[in-house]
Structures are given as C-alpha cells and as structure tokens.
Amino acid sequence: MKLWAGRFSKEADKKTNDFNSSIKTDSRMFNEDIDGSIAHASMLAAKGIISGEDCEKILAGLSDIRNDIISGELMIDPDAEDIHTFIEGELTSRIGDAGKRLHTGRSRNDQVAVDIRLYLRKDVQSVTKLINGLIAALDGKAKEYARCIMLGYTHLQRAQPITFSAHIGAYIEMLRRDLGRFEDAAERMNLSPLGSGALAGTTYPIDRAMTAKALGFDGYMPNTLDGVSDRDFCLELLGACSILMVHISRLCEEIIMWCSWEFKFAELDDAFSTGSSIMPQKKNPDLAELARGKAGRVIGDLCGLLTTMKGLPLAYNKDMQEDKDAIFDGMDTVKMCLTALTPMIATMKMIPENMRKAAAGGFINATDCADFLVSKGLPFRDAYKATGELVALCIKNGTTLEELPIDEYKSICPLFDEGVYDAINLENCVTRRGM
C-alpha cells in the first residue's frame, strides 16, 4: 500500500522503496501511532467530520491491530514504507472504507511528529528511573566506605586527601544534573504537533486542544510549520544523553584504573568481569570499558543529527527521517549502559587499606601544613613558600612530612611546633574539610 500512489503512473523501483522505507526503525512506535490515531479519530467524530459509526469501527479495528501485534498474531510487514502506512493499510483491509477516513485532516508529517514525542516521553521515564538506580548504587557504595581516605588528584597528580564518599558524591551530583536535563527536555517536548498537517494546518474544523489533552500533552504547538519541522526535542535529549555518557565514561575510566594492579583500589565481582582467551590470569573490566567506548557512539548520534538539521529549510524534509535512528540509538545505548553498570557498581568491593596506604605518599597534606603556619599568624604566601622548602627537604632526605623531626620544621620556620603533626594527619585533614 502506498499513501501517495495516485499521482504516479509507474510503480516505484524496489531500490527506491528500500531506500525510502523507515519501517525497521519506526516499527517500535506502533503503540504510539495507534494512540495518536485513536485520539485523532475520536476528535474527528466529535467535530462531525466523520460519523460516529465509522469512528467506532476505526477504534475497534485499531484496538484489534494493537492486540494482534502485541500477541504476535500480526507481524509488521518489513516491506512496508513505514509504521503509519502499515497500520492504516491493515486497518482498511479489516474494516473497509471507514479506514480510509482515518487520515482526514492529518498528514504523516504531524503524525510522525506526535508518535515520536509520545514514544520519547515514555523512554525518558525509563532513563530517569535507571539514572536514579545508578545514583542509589553509588550512594550505597559511598555509605559503605564513608570514612575511607583516598588520594585526591588534580592534573592526575597527587593533590589533597579526600574521602571515597566525597569522590563518589561528585558523580552523584553529576547524575542529579543529568536527571534535571532529561526532565527539562521532556517538559519542553510535551506539546502536541497533531493538527499541523503537512505544514499549513487543515481546513477541517478540528480541535487540536482535544487531541492534545487526550494524548496527555500540556497543550499544542501554535505554529504548524514548527510543529512538523521541529526536532529540537530529539537534539535536546541527545544532548542530555551525551552529557550523561561523558559522566559515565569518566566514572568508568576511574573504575578501570582502580581495578588495575597498579592501583588495586577496587575489585569487580566475577559476575561483572571477563577474562582473556590466552592469558589465564586476566580479569578484565569489560563492562566499564564498553560503556566508556559507547560514550563516543552517543556523542556521534548527537553530532550526526545536528549536522542533518543544520541546513534544512522549513518545513518538513525527508532528511528528518534520520532523527529516529539517532535518538533511538542514543536512548537505547544509555539504557543499556545504565542497566549494566548499576549492578556492577553495587557489587564492586573497594580496598580501603590500599587506598589509605597510597594516600600516605606524595605530600598530599602539604596544604594543611601551610594552613598550620597561617593559623600561627604567617601570611599564606610565606607559609606556602616555607612548606615548599619542607617538601623539597623531605624529597632530598627520602622522608615524609609525618616523619620529619620537629627540629627540621623549625629550621625552616620557627613558628612550627608539635601541633603540626596533628594538622597534617590525614584523618584530621579530611575531617577539618567536612568530608
């Protein structure tokens, strides 16, 4: 079945059909397409545009088609042009001429626009639920190792002592912002484009507010050209997906390092690790590595759709068929990563003794040593210089600030006293900072 066959004297070449078809991508929206058609048909009947009898046939037929697809009794035709064509054709074959009235006052342009918004509205709920699950796993891990002291880095150089819970807390804050981005995008997306027609609305006395309300939208898009040509919501969601995946990638990078023999800060559960086909000793953090790699894929989806949209004149263009490949892949990838990583993190074991031992080196309490002098009245820049000289002395003598005798401290600055050892104790350092 072709919805546009009347004007043409030749059948489309098979290569044209194959290239033009989007059924492999948009078939997942069959539920949303049926929901949109039910709302549209009900409105048409309410406005007297189609008869109540035809509307009843349409609604019953659409309900049967939905049930048959879900049960597997009806298979979606892989040769159909798109899901809209397939469902309308199937409906007409079942109920006759009444099915031909369904598309009155509607274009596939506004039909697909409403379908994808309905589908993504549900998908966003799935993603936010998964993000909350990852936050819960991270929060549980932070509480489990709340007082575990570890190295804090800047420039990947040892910087200051921190707690594991503070470190993980940073990722929790990132994920909370991610939640906000998805929620904000979903709110802007929740306007109905149905009734926009091909681009210029329709001459039929339709009720756009009625269909918007029936489909759970907050209202409808006032400009019909924008209604069919807007894909900002896809770009916004892909932007949210990309930022989320950047955060996930950063977390995974650290987990990968922590699980290495060089760090030995953490160990993943066997159920969430893999091995090598040739090296018997290997225990690889493949889930974390795959998630890190998939960040590039999602960012690519965003860049691809941005590039597709950047040169399109108003209103609808067939280029926009690429939107679903990008947004579905981005959202699917995010859900896959969140689903895999949450139990991996929940079962991950930290090794506090190794983390504490590593924190003892690298003079990460030097700032606290300088702050001790400031507490004695020395200007910070002078305290900074004196502490730098102490660090140089320790490096020369192969010792640490904790091991350096008080006489050596006093040789650099007479304001030092025995209290400096309490000041540079790592546990005291993190406590004073409220970590």
What residue spans do the PLM features occupy?
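Short runs of predominantly hydrophobic/aromatic residues within well-ordered alpha helices
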Residues: 37, 84, 88, 234-237, ...
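Charged, flexible cofactor/metal-binding loops and thiol motifs
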Residues: 121, 143, 151, 157-311, ...
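Glycine-rich cofactor/substrate-binding loops
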Residues: 1-36, 97-98, 279-435
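A helix-coil-helix interface module used to build multimeric assemblies
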Residues: 1-201, 206-212, 274-275, 286, ...
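A local structural micro-motif
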Residues: 52-53, 150, 183, 220, ...
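Short, well-ordered beta-strand elements within core beta-sheets of diverse protein domains
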Residues: 40-50, 119, 166, 235-243, ...
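Generic, well-ordered alpha-helical scaffold segments in large soluble proteins
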Residues: 40, 61, 65-68, 90, ...
